[in-house]
A protein has these predicted regions:
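Bacterial Sec-dependent N-terminal signal peptides
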Residues: 13-52
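Beta-strand-rich domains and repeat architectures in extracellular enzymes and scaffolds
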Residues: 48-68, 86-94
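Repeated scaffold domains used in trafficking and secretory/extracellular systems
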Residues: 88-100, 128-138, 167-177, 210-220, ...
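Short beta-strand elements that form the blades of beta-propeller/WD-repeat-like
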Residues: 51-63, 102-108, 140-148, 179-188, ...
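Feature 14080 marks short, conserved micro-sites in well-ordered regions
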Residues: 79-91, 97-99, 104-108, 124-130, ...
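Hydrophobic strand positions within the blades of repeat-based beta-sheet folds
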Residues: 56-57, 69-70, 96, 105-106, ...
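Sec-dependent bacterial lipoprotein signal peptides
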Residues: 1-14
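Surface-exposed loop/turn elements that mediate protein-protein interactions on large endomembrane-trafficking
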Residues: 70-81, 112-123, 152-163, 193-205, ...
C-alpha cells in the first residue's frame, strides 16, 4: 500500500476566511412564518439544493427570558417554542434531532425522559436516558438511548423497547438501505467482543483473518471488518482485502469504518501521540494511508463524493474543513455542536455554524459561502429532504 508523507492538519495551517455576506432576515415577533419578502438572498450565498427542501433548527437567545427553539424551512420560520422545564424542551443541541423536516427533542427530568415532536409531547419513558441517536424510517421513529443510572443501552421503535442490553458500548444507530443497524461491543475478562445488530437481530462478529477485531459495519448488505495484526491494519469484506502499515509513535484510541459511495468503505484509526498532547487519525482509503490531525474533535461525511472531514482545532476557536477533492476551508470564531449539524447533498457539504463569542448571526455554510440567519443564537441541526 502507498504510505503518503504524513501531515497534520492543525491550527498552524493558513486560514481561508471569507466575509459575512448579506443576511437572511427573519421576524422576531410571534408569527410562526415570516412573509417571503423578509427573506433575501444574494449572489454570494450558497445555492440551495436543487429540487430539495432545506430544514434547520436553532435556539434564539431572549434577554431575561428562556430561549426559543425554532424550526426553519428554506429560511422561513415554521414554529417557535420556549425552552422550559414545563414544555420539556432543552436548548442543548444534543437533545435536538431534525429528521425529514420534523424536529424531535429529548428532555430528562425527575426520573423520566420526554420525547417531543415539533414541540408537542410524543413519548414518555419511566427512566432518565441520554438519547444518542434517532432515525425516522417510513414514519417509524427508531431511537438509541443510554440510561443515565443504569448500564447498557436500549433501542426503541415508536417509543417501545425492541432491543436492549444490560452491558455493552454502542456505536451509532445507522441505516443500511431500509435496515436499522448498530454495532456494539462488550468486554469480559479483558476480551472484547463485537456484535452487529440488524433490525433488532444480533450477530456476534468473527474476524475473518484470525487477527484482533477492531470494528465491523454493514454497508450495502455486506459486512466490512477492520482487524489488527501487528504491524498492519486489515480492512476487508467479500473479495476485498487491504493492508495498511500502522503509524509508529502513536497509541490506538478507537476506530471507525466509514461508508463510501460505490459500495466501498474506508477506515479512520483514532490515535494518541506518545510524544505530544495531540490526537490524529490514520485514514485508510483504497490503497492509500495518511495521518490527519484531529484537533479537539472531528466528524466525517463520506456517503457522497467528495468525502469531507470537519475538525475543531485544538484551541477550539477554528473549524477546519477539508476533503478528498483537495479543497480546504477555515472558519474562525465558530462552534459546531455535533455531527447532526452537517449534511451532504449533490456533492456539497452544508454545515450549521454559530458564532462562538455570541456576536453576529449563525449561518449555513456551504463550500466557503454563507447564508446567515438573522437572529442572536445558534443553529443546532440541519436536514435536506425532497419537497413535501
Amino acid at each position: 500500500m502507498k504510505q503518503l508523507p504524513l501531515f497534520l492538519m492543525l491550527a498552524g495551517l493558513f486560514a481561508c476566511s471569507s466575509p459575512i455576506h448579506d443576511d437572511l432576515s427573519f421576524s422576531r415577533g410571534d408569527t410562526t412564518r415570516p412573509n417571503t419578502d423578509e427573506t433575501k438572498n444574494d449572489n454570494e450565498s450558497p445555492e440551495l439544493p436543487k429540487d430539495k427542501t432545506l430544514y434547520a433548527c436553532g435556539v434564539i437567545y431572549v434577554d431575561g427570558h428562556p430561549s426559543d427553539l425554532v424550526l426553519f424551512k428554506d429560511g422561513l420560520r415554521q414554529f417557535t417554542i420556549k425552552c422550559t422545564d414545563e414544555n420539556h424542551i432543552s436548548p442543548d443541541a444534543d437533545s435536538h434531532f431534525l429528521l425529514d423536516g420534523i424536529l424531535f427533542t429529548s428532555f430528562n427530568t425527575k426520573g423520566k425522559t420526554f420525547i417531543s415532536k415539533n414541540g408537542e409531547p410524543l413519548y414518555e419513558f419511566a427512566t432518565e436516558e441520554y438519547l444518542k441517536d434517532m432515525l425516522l424510517v417510513d414514519q417509524t421513529l427508531w431511537s438509541l438511548s443510554i440510561p443515565l443510572n443504569e448500564n447498557g443501552f436500549k433501542i426503541r421503535k415508536d417509543g417501545e423497547v425492541v432491543f436492549s442490553k444490560q452491558d455493552g458500548s454502542p456505536k451509532s444507530l445507522y441505516l443500511d438501505g431500509s435496515d436499522v443497524c448498530l454495532e456494539y461491543s462488550t468486554l469480559w475478562n479483558m476480551k472484547r467482543k463485537i456484535y452487529l445488530v440488524k433490525n433488532t437481530i444480533e450477530t456476534p462478529v468473527t474476524p475473518p483473518h484470525s487477527a484482533t477485531l477492531l470494528d465491523a459495519r454493514i454497508h450495502e448488505g455486506k459486512i466490512w471488518y477492520l482487524e489488527y495484526n501487528n504491524p498492519f491494519y486489515i480492512l476487508s469484506t467479500n473479495r476485498v482485502y487491504r493492508q495498511f502499515m500502522k503509524t509508529y509513535g502513536f497509541e490506538l484510541l478507537d476506530t471507525d469504518i466509514l461508508p463510501l459511495e460505490n459500495s466501498d468503505c474506508a477506515a479512520a484509526i483514532h490515535l494518541q501521540s506518545n510524544y505530544a498532547p495531540m490526537t490524529a487519525d490514520q485514514l485508510c482509503i483504497k490503497d492509500t494511508t495518511f495521518l490527519s490531525g484531529n484537533g479537539t474533535s472531528s466528524y466525517y461525511y463520506t456517503l457522497q463524493a467528495p468525502a469531507r472531514k470537519v475538525t475543531l482545532t485544538k484551541d477550539r476557536d477554528k473549524l477546519y474543513i477539508n476533503g478528498s477533492d483537495g479543497n480546504e476551508y477555515f472558519e474562525e470564531n465558530v462552534f459546531f455542536p455535533n455531527r447532526r449539524c452537517g449534511a451532504q447533498e449533490d456533492g456539497k457539504l452544508y454545515l450549521c455554524l454559530s458564532q462562538k463569542d455570541g456576536k453576529g448571526y449563525p449561518f449555513i455554510w456551504c463550500e466557503g459561502k454563507k447564508m446567515p440567519y438573522k437572529f442572536q443564537g445558534e443553529l443546532t441541526g440541519i436536514c435536506i429532504t425532497a419537497p413535501n
